[in-house]
C-alpha cells in the first residue's frame, strides 16, 4: 500500500512555513512599502504553524510534523526572531506567537523537554521576554511566555541568578497598572514556585535582594506595597526559607519598619504587616536588639494590639494570634544585668 505524503500540495511543510515566516519578518523589519503583504503572510504562516502544533477540531497534531517544526524553529533561529519582532506582528499574530511558544515549550520527548534545553543554551531569549515589560504593546504577551518558562526549574534558575533579575523591582513599580501587576505575578512566581532553588538563591543574595525589597515595602504605590508585604509574609513563613526568616527577624530595622506599617492608613496594609510582625514576636530565639525594641515599646504595643482591627470579629484565628502576641509581649522581661 502506497504511503500517503505527510503534506499535500496545498499544505506547506514545516521547513517551507518557517522560511516564509522568516522572509516576511525580515520585510517587516525594514518597515518599507511591502509591509501589508508581508504582514498578511506572517499571519497565514503563524496560523499554519499553530495548526501543526495544536491540531484542528477533527485532527490530533501529527507527531512527525510537530517534531519537524520544532527542529526548524531551533535550527533557523526563528524562535528568537519571533520574540525580537513581536512588536511588528499584528494583535492576533501576537496571540498566535504566545500560543506557539508555550506549546513548543511544553513539548516532551520521554523525560526530555527539548525547548527548555534550547532556551537554556540561548538564555538571551529569557532576557528578551523580560525586557518586553518595557514595551507596553507586548508586555502582557511577554509576561505569559515568561511565566511558562518559569515553570521549568532550569529556566527559572537562569533568571534568578542573572543581573537582570533586579529589573523586576523596577517593573513592578511601572505606572501602567496592568503591566506592573503582570510583572508582580511573574516576580512572585519566580520566588515561590521552586522552593529549594529559591531558598538557595535568597541565602546567597540576601543583602542585595532585601535592600531592593525594602523599597517595595515603602512604595508610594498602594498595590505594590500591599502585594510586597503579602509576599514577604509568605516567604518568611515557608519552612524552606527558615534561614532567611531567621536572618530577617534578627534585624531591628525590619521590626521598626513593620511597627510603622502596623499604623499605615490602609487597614489592608496593617493586616499584612501584622502577619510579618507576629513572626518577630512569636520567635523563641529573639536577638537582644529585638527584645530591647519590644520592651521599650511594651505598654504601647499591648494597648495598640488590644484595639487593633477589632472590627474583624469573624476572624477567630486573627483574634487568637493577637491575644498570643499580647501575652508574649507582656511576658517579656529585661535581661539580668
From Swiss-Prot:
Superkingdom in the source lineage: Eukaryota
A Pfam cross-reference name: Mo25
Signal peptide start-end: none
Coiled coil location: none
SUPFAM superfamilies attached to this UniProt entry: ARM repeat
Subunit comment: Component of a trimeric complex composed of STK11/LKB1, STRAD (STRADA or STRADB) and CAB39/MO25 (CAB39/MO25alpha or CAB39L/MO25beta): the complex tethers STK11/LKB1 in the cytoplasm and stimulates its catalytic activity.
Function: Component of a complex that binds and activates STK11/LKB1. In the complex, required to stabilize the interaction between CAB39/MO25 (CAB39/MO25alpha or CAB39L/MO25beta) and STK11/LKB1.
Family: Belongs to the Mo25 family.
Name of protein: Calcium-binding protein 39-like
